[in-house]
Amino acid sequence: MKKTPQILTALLLGSSFAGGVFAEEHRPNTPSAEYELEKVLIFSRHGLRSPVEKDPQEMAKYSPYEWAKWDVPSGYLTAKGTVLETYFGQYLGQWLADQGLLTAERCASGEGIFAYANGVQRTIATGQAIVAGAFAGCNVQLQHHGKIGSEKDPIFNTQAHNPSQALIESAKNNVDLTALQKKLVPNYALLSEIIDYKNSPNCLQKGECDLGGKVGEYSIKDGKSVKITGAISTGKKIVSALLLAHYVGKPDAEIANGRVDSQEKWRAINEIKNEYYRTLFKNNEALAQNVSYPLLAFIQQQLNSKNKISLLVGHDSNIVALLAALGVEPYELNDSLENIPIGGKLLFEVWKHKPSGKLKFKLDYVYQTTEQLINITPLSLATPPNQTALTLKGCEKDEKGFCDYERFQQVLSESIKNGKK
């Protein structure tokens, strides 16, 4: 397991403790004085990156327009992404200090703080930025497995683990790709118009002129990532490239020639990507458990450890699988174009009810709004990111929004056990 030294940048305008002391009174994540935060595990999606396509001509076939040019290699965290994650880290550090978990003693020793990222550049760089923001001046080092980009970390792999034929058939029967295709007809039509697909090399040279024409298939293979092929996969790739350019602030001429000219259009085309993620494990909790049980087991290990603060940095595919495996109910994220936002964070929170001593659990999705992403808004307790409470169908909430921690541990254990079947 490699350790990456903490990187401090000129972007840090003060420590987490200073921010926590002088911030205005704002407690977006504190249930009441009767509860105290015992520990938290933060699972973060990596921050704002460049598109993952390595061939610069890969996107050219979809549109006659010029695509955005990037100053970092494919799939790398951008400079803006580093700033955004540093700001997010500063907010987290202030919140953790405010809740009494990030103390001066814990900062100095580093004991009880664990930070671990998948071994690719965008996750490691994201982790470094969060650590720099949250734990400025602390004895905290980000860890990862193997050499950067050279080895796959099994914890973060979202591949099927020897799925039975019965599981594969059941999962495929639970997904109606034809109905999904019909549902997205207007979205494909708008995207096709925006990128001028009728004048693309795909249409003019190959005769493939219907962007939404291929229903595709639900692909489940041992040792391979679960995926949906066809038009929704192509649409997701195109929308992702446009959205990343939008977030990073590329000129309009490099974003479909300026044709995505309203928030309504952004929401409409991004629904293709959102539906891909909603559908990937929809009604397929068992498959999600099969895919994600190594990560679920690692999360349980960290929650059961002496660590008070754990940070894991992975990918959107990890979050999609985790939410499905744990039976999280459908949700909506206000002020976000994405349902799995870039840089978004799942907070697995263990709280103690002080009068009774009982442990309670909350799962929150904390994320930067679209406006905060684009404007590079500094975050603090006074200007926090958005937060949405998630609901696990197997863990009933009380009137305060908590479920019993013991019951959550049962849900987690059952998910891991089912995944190993």
Task: Locate the predicted segments by residue.
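Sec/Tat signal peptide C-region and signal peptidase I cleavage site
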Residues: 19-23
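Short linear Ser/Thr-Pro motifs
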Residues: 16-18, 126
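Signature for phosphate-centric chemistry
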Residues: 24-114, 118-310, 316-421
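Bacterial N-terminal signal peptides that target proteins for export
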Residues: 1-8
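Bacterial N-terminal signal peptides
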Residues: 9-16
